[in-house]
Amino acid sequence: MRRIAVSSVLAVSLWGCSHAPSTPPAAPPPTSASQPSAAPPPAPASSAPPAANAVDPAAVQALQKMGAYLQTLRTFEAQVDLSGERVLQDGQKLLHMATAKVDVQRPNMLRAEMRSARSARDLIYDGKTVVLYLPEQKYYSKAPFTENLDALGNRLQERYGIELPVADLFLWGTPQAPLDNMTSAMNAGQDVVEGEVCDHYAFRQGNVDWQIWIAAGARPLPRKLVITNRADEARPQSVSLIRWRINPGFKESRFAFTPPQGATEAKFVPLKSQ
């Protein structure tokens, strides 16, 4: 059996790079002794960063309402268009794109198909075994797993370095929802996303600013997500646009994996043994 590492094979790597320090401002010209004295300059402004917007409880409640609705969905299909910026050493930004199609049947079935110009990856989970398949190379790896979908993303990331697309969709509406360490939360009004009126919210957590557009009305589905990395002075962003199909009729075979002819099994390599 072939042994390969799978660390980060599903992640779209869009991290920013370091930058040279900015040029300091020029010193002011000297004042001539023959000139009349000018009025004393104003006191310098504080160098402290401006205070963030307060945490609006209504914005947090909107996330909780969205999460509660997501937890009611037994089957759904989410199609995601992802674009993300990579920052070069000289500060120039490159935009990369990928797509993902995620089919879900709660509590424990999933099929995710991820595609970009650089790679193709399929992740299949039937409630007993999780399989990673590389269709272009015809390699597949599998590991036993029996937990629900809200635990799948974290376990794959922690043990194998595999990133599940839109993994937070399974956490919203649970005690594990990422609501901690918020320093800013605000309602930014309404926008239209692909013809659908959405409520626009903005949040700050640590070195991350993120915005979410949630469909207005009885089905508060997340339609668009923008994440900004504040730890990088270039502020690179990733943008996810999500299209939904609710209650599709999946056959059980959708979540089963049969190795194609000529496919080779490759052993999962946990991160701790790499």
Locate each region found by the language model:
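Flexible, processing/modification-adjacent segments and terminal tails
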Residues: 41, 49-50, 54-62, 90, ...
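C-terminal motif of bacterial Sec signal peptides marking the signal peptidase cleavage site
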Residues: 14-16
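N-terminal mature ectodomain segment of secretory-pathway/periplasmic proteins
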Residues: 54-139
